[in-house]
Amino acid sequence: MRFLAPLLALLLLGGCAQLNAFKDLAGAITDKIQGSDNAEPPKELQPLEPTVNMSVLWTTQVGKGSLGRILNLMPAVTATTVYAADHKGAVVAVERASGDVQWSKDTGLEIASGPVVAGDKLLFGTSNAELVAISLADGALIWKTALTSEMMSLPRVSHNLVIARTSDGRIAAFDLGHGGIKWSHERTLPPLSIRSQGSPTLHGDLVLDGFGAGKLIALNLQDGHLVWEATAVVPRGRSEVERMVELDADAMVQGDVVYATGFQGGLSAIDLRNGSILWHQKTAYTSHATALSRKSLFITDTNSDIWSMDITNGADQWKQDVLHQRRLTVPTRVKDYLVVGDFEGYLHLLRADNGSLVGRLELSGEDPIVATPLAFEDVLYVLTSDGLLAAV
């Protein structure tokens, strides 16, 4: 899994233990997350004659990037403008067509997630347990709301409500206009849990979110009451590590089906109407988001192998391991292709129907691409860990 050492530093241990016991547990989790081949080096890139060419349209610098931290910084795009931020609070608005900077603002925030466009506002979560809204026009502060703990997930917006998940397991709704709290849902985290960057999924009047013990919940958007709870995977095993099951990836919805995956959680299809399990497969899992097409679901697993699975039953359609252990991003769909970034600053283009590699672009020399590339009108917007924002 990407960023293993920082993830281990973020483990939540209930009741806890002596230091030596913690070290043993951390070592076991290291092996479990990275897999039995954790010492295996990333595959070297082989010569490629591209059949589809990618080129850089423009680049600009966004502060200092993530400063080596595990954050959820991603570009946000509108019809005219691309917005991005760094961890130390630098926010820039860039003209989408030319890459010219329209405005920049030093907010002073320790930004952990965002930005997300919501009407005339940009929304962020911070490492200092804040949900913040600034002006889309010039970056001026509109409101700031205190949370119960840091916010690693992206804010979600629907019906004038901002849904925020914090790392202590709470989900809360806030008024988009002034930041006042509307409701809060608290859940009990399992004794051992990995702090997740996954974000709630909003669909109709439901808030969908996965967490430990293999559970996915649906809350009512307006008042936060529990509509249903599904146990997609029953934790099994003799050790605490073997029993860790986190549905921590963003849930995906198509029709009346929600697809959920996460650490040691396999992939599950769940009936959106009542939470019943339609099917479950154990072949692959990811702690990051997935991509959907009409017939397939695409994931980058913990070994950076890319899978295509049938959305009707979870059957494998293809697997691509040519980029094994290259710390890939979540796949992004662009027409008939998938795009992933890697730890050396390369973008890779694959055919969605068979997984074959058809294009490659070195975006920035050895500067990792960790944020999911964002596609808008056949242009990709990519933010590297050092703060390079590029249109491709």
Set out the residue ranges of the language-model regions.
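Extracytoplasmic beta-rich repeat domains
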Residues: N20-I29, T51-A76, W103-A118, L141-S158, ...
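Blade/loop signatures of beta-propeller domains
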Residues: T30-T59, L226
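Short coil/turn segments within WD40 beta-propeller repeats
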Residues: G89, A129-E130, G169, G214, ...
